[in-house]
């Protein structure tokens, strides 16, 4: 293996995505990252590679990764990788990175990714930006992003013309957005939140031409210092906001009677076939658990219908739902910012409007 020097930036080329799989099923975040990685690779004029680890890896789904943008897929198949361990996965991924030298490494900000990413960054002596919500290498595209998401006077601000990865993430509890670069070290590493990147349509031609390459790992049982004895799935059922077709979200506007407000939201979600979401104010108050939270510090959703009940429309919340197909806002304040992004708006008391809405929907279904 050639000597690895994280500061020899010119030696690194290509965009990589760690494609997480569980029990033989590729996770949705992997397709999202491949779709985003494809854009970055196109802007840089380089190859996009997916990396898959596991035991008894199904080669059929490896080809499918090409349909979401991968030019090449490296896969590592070993009984020692059947269950995730920090030692095993970090060693194998770091060894491969040191050999192939990608300039960008993207990992999903899942429980697994949040453990694996920083471990690898530390071993490789490079930086990692966690929980990213936006990525750019093209300065012009980054400027366009800033024009729509910030108050920066882009046209009168000087930007360095380079292809460093610009990694944007929430900071200070979601009150600010910070863009971080890693100009002196490679690879540039980022973990990306599930749901913030859109998955591109499957491309049969891409799946047909992707190159699948098996890698034999230099991994032994002695390299793994933790033994997985058993895996138990949580009995707690978490709300699936990201996969929902309809989301009914509640905000600070339910503060007059939180219990009643949430009950109305649940009933409306029930008749619409959706799930209940919330703004940060609601989860911070303890009215709903954190898995219901939508926004920069919560989940990013793209449902067919998003109903905002008593949500003012703070930029941190809007960032997590503005790409919904149809946004219906109900708020007493006619000047609430939520109406700026709403497809349909109702100015009124949600405690009066929602029961009528539920009644009309039930009547229409009868």
Annotate the PLM regions.
Residues 1-366:
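N-terminal glycine-rich FAD/FM-binding segment characteristic of electron-transfer flavoproteins
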